[in-house]
């Protein structure tokens, strides 16, 4: 709400006011009112008639202010009265708005003693206004009021006050004190401001120091991190260098160890080769061949067996010299077809030799060639796979076998005309006499060895039937066994023995082909049959097993005329001739020597003993390899069912088919070839040993020394 305004008509208001308060002026009142529609105060009228004249100028529709000077007889100075006129017709809102303007108007007009509020002329009473002006100063006109005033004055107590007389010194002290405190207050404010500044500076300095410390710590951490990374990198490089050195060292050690192993293997190989070469050289230089003794025994036995019958030439290209094994015991019953295809081969002392099939070498190279080449000087030994040798032989025996293989394979067969006898042939010539003397000693014991007879070269007939692997693995009986069982004439025995002597003589002296073994011979003065003890006194009867007779060759007989095993078993045995009486019964042979027993029980024996035991097997393996290289594998005919490869036999004794020498066949026809005889089922094996060791004393001493 806006207040009263004096600015619009300020000069007029003050001029009228001055006229009223001034003593020299005749005017004693002035009337003021609001300008239309505003709060600006203005002068309405003025005069000299006092309260009576002033009360006549008030209006009922306005709010007006009257300033009047009243003179009192009892007072020396006039009194000033301010009348607040509010007309009856003034709106209430205007009344409320102007109620607050009274104090400001009284303040504007200084010296107002009494303010009188009036809304009508009756409210403006000169006596009442004078009474109020004279209250406390003049005596009251009423006696009652006078008594009351006196009574109040008597009972009134003195009023206390703090007013004192002004003292200059005290006032100076007070002023100085105030100045001091003001100065102190200012100083305190300055101090506080300085403290705030100092605190702020300290805070800033602390923050800076903290930031600097953090920066230094960060740099220190980074420095430590870099140092740690450098250390780790150096350690990694050192580790890598150590690993590289370790790898180089291991590689060097491996290379050194590999070189050492290679040197050791090479030295071991050289040592083994030197031992084999030395053994082969010693074997080649010995005067007597221990195998020749058994060949002569086989020839004698075959010649004796041939004297009991007169067989025709065999229609098959069968290899002669297959001895009759004394360990075979055939059964008397059982069909041949079922047993030959279903039964398994028996266990033998030489399992590898049993199942290993070799071609017939006798059709291309004679026995004399092999023996003469074997007596020649040895050559370097080529390496062979371990599978080519027998599983029962020792490493030394395998090496000896390789040496003999190299000797026999590297020497070409000599030309047909006999060359002049050399020193070596002259040295080996006395070996026949020594062998004959040894034969005489051995025949004193109750032993008989199956011999071999020369076989004429015949054209190989193609196999009639294709053989199966099972039938190929079946073992057959040697033709010498059939020859011993078949009847023969005594006259043929003498001729066969003479042929054997002539073949031995040519074999040991000239080392050439034996094409004249069966033709260019002279009858011997004395038969080797007489060398056997008792001259037939200890001869035994033929074996109980039936033998298939030898089929005649050519047009005399055909393959269909060969009786089967069952049919042959029903025929009566022929009478034993005079030549057959000289043969011993193989069932009555003594036990074989312990050196040719089951090799599976001799694993723990010494090297020397194993070399002695496996020498025949190693030498025979050489012949088997030569047979495989020089001649295709012919087939034999079984009991009318399928063809069977030559090189299989039912069982092995000391002279198994795989272990025996492959005797060469002559190109000219020989006396006879006994047919093969087969069993209905695999025969039983009688593992026996001979009392006498067939190895010569010189060879035993040499191999025992190794």
From Swiss-Prot:
Residues 357-366, 382-396, 639-651 have a biased composition (Polar residues). This is Drebrin. InterPro entries: ADF-H, ADF-H/Gelsolin-like_dom_sf. It comes from the Eukaryota. Residues 209-497, 633-677 are annotated as: Disordered. One of its GO terms (molecular function) is profilin binding. Residues 331-345, 453-497 have a biased composition (Low complexity). Residues 3-134 form the ADF-H domain. The modification N-acetylalanine is found at residue 2. The modification Phosphothreonine is found at residues 379, 383, 394, 550. Residues 209-236, 288-298 have a biased composition (Basic and acidic residues). Actin cytoskeleton-organizing protein that plays a role in the formation of cell projections. Required for actin polymerization at immunological synapses (IS) and for the recruitment of the chemokine receptor CXCR4 to IS. Plays a role in dendritic spine morphogenesis and organization, including the localization of the dopamine receptor DRD1 to the dendritic spines. Involved in memory-related synaptic plasticity in the hippocampus. Residues 411-422 have a biased composition (Pro residues). Interacts with RUFY3. Interacts with CXCR4; this interaction is enhanced by antigenic stimulation. Interacts (via ADF-H domain) with ZMYND8 (via N-terminus); the interaction leads to sequestering of ZMYND8 in the cytoplasm. GO terms for cellular component: actin cytoskeleton; cell cortex; cell-cell junction; cytoplasm; dendrite; gap junction; glutamatergic synapse; growth cone. It is found in: Cytoplasm; Cell projection, Dendrite; Cytoplasm, Cell cortex; Cell junction. Disruption phenotype: Mice are born at the expected Mendelian frequency. Mutant mice exhibit significant reduction of dendritic spine numbers, altered dendritic spine morphology with a reduction in the number of mushroom, thin and stubby types of dendritic spines, decreased protein levels of the neurotransmitter receptors DRD1, DRD2, HTR1A and 5HT7R and reduced numbers of DRD1 receptors on dendritic spines. Inhibited memory-related high-frequency-induced synaptic strengthening. One of its GO terms (biological process) is positive regulation of dendritic spine morphogenesis. The lineage of its organism: Eukaryota, Metazoa, Chordata, Craniata, Vertebrata.
């Amino acid at each position: 709400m806006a207040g009263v305004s004096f600015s619009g008509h300020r000069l007029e208001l003050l001029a009228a006011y001055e006229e009223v308060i001034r003593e020299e002026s005749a005017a004693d009142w002035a009337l003021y009112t609001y300008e239309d529609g505003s709060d600006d105060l203005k002068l309405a009228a003025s005069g000299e008639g006092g309260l009576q004249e002033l009360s006549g100028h008030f209006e009922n529709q306005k709010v007006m202010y009257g300033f009047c000077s009243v003179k009192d007889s009892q007072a020396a100075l006039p009194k000033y009265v301010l009348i607040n006129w509010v007309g009856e017709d003034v709106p209430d809102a205007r009344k409320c708005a102007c109620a607050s303007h009274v104090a400001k108007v009284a303040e504007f007009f200084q010296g107002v003693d009494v303010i009188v509020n009036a809304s009508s002329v009756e409210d403006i009473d000169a006596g009442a206004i004078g009474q109020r002006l004279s209250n406390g100063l003049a005596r009251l006109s009423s006696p009652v009021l006078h008594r009351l005033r006196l009574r109040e004055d008597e009972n009134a107590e003195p009023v206390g006050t703090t007013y004192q007389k002004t003292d200059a010194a005290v006032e100076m002290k007070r002023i100085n004190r105030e100045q001091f405190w003001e100065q102190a207050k200012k100083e305190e404010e300055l101090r506080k401001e300085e403290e705030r500044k100092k605190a702020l500076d300290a805070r800033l300095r602390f923050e800076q120091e903290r930031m600097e410390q953090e920066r230094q710590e960060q740099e220190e951490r980074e420095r430590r991190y870099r140092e740690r990374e450098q250390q780790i990198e150096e350690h990694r490089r050192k580790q890598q260098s150590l690993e590289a050195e370790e790898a180089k060292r291991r590689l060097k050690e491996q290379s050194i160890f590999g070189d050492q192993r290679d040197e050791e293997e090479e030295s071991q190989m050289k040592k083994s080769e030197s031992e084999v070469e030395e053994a082969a050289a010693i074997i080649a230089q010995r005067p007597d061949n221990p195998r020749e003794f058994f060949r002569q025994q086989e020839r004698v036995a075959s010649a004796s067996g041939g004297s009991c019958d007169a067989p025709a030439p065999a229609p098959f290209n069968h290899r002669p010299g297959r001895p009759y094994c004394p360990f075979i015991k055939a059964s008397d019953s059982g069909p041949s077809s079922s047993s030959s295809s279903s039964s398994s081969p028996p266990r033998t002392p030489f399992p590898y030799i049993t199942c290993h099939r070799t071609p017939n070498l006798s059709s291309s190279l004679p026995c004399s060639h092999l023996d003469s080449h074997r007596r020649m000087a040895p050559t370097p030994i080529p390496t062979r796979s371990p599978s080519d040798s027998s599983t029962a032989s020792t490493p030394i025996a395998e090496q000896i076998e390789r040496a003999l293989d190299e000797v026999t394979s590297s020497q070409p067969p000599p030309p047909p005309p006999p060359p002049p006898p050399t020193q070596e042939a002259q040295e080996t010539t006395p070996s026949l006499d020594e062998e004959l003397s040894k034969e005489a000693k051995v025949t004193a014991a109750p032993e008989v060895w199956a011999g071999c007879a020369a076989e004429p070269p015949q054209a190989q007939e193609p196999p009639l039937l294709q053989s199966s692997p099972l039938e190929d693995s079946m073992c057959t009986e040697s033709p010498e066994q059939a020859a011993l069982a078949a009847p023969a004439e005594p006259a043929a025995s003498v001729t066969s023995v003479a042929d054997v002597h002539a073949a031995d003589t040519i074999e040991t002296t000239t080392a050439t082909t034996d094409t004249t073994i069966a033709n260019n011979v002279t009858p011997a003065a004395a038969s080797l049959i007489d060398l056997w003890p008792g001259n037939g006194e200890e001869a035994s009867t033929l074996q109980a097993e039936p033998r298939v007779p030898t089929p005649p060759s050519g047009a005399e007989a055909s393959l269909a005329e060969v009786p089967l095993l069952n049919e042959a078993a029903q025929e009566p045995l022929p009478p034993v001739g005079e030549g057959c009486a000289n043969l011993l019964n193989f069932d009555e042979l003594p036990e074989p020597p312990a050196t040719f027993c089951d090799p599976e029980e001799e694993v723990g024996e010494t090297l020397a003993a194993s070399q002695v035991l496996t020498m025949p097997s190693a030498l025979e393996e050489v012949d088997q390899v030569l047979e495989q290289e020089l001649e295709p594998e012919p087939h034999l005919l079984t009991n009318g069912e399928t063809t069977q490869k030559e090189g299989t036999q039912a069982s092995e004794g000391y002279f198994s088919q795989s272990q025996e020498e492959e005797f060469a066949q002559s190109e000219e026809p020989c006396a006879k070839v006994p047919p093969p005889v087969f069993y209905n089922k695999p025969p039983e094996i009688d593992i026996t040993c001979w009392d006498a060791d067939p190895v010569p004393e010189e060879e035993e001493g040499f191999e025992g020394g190794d």
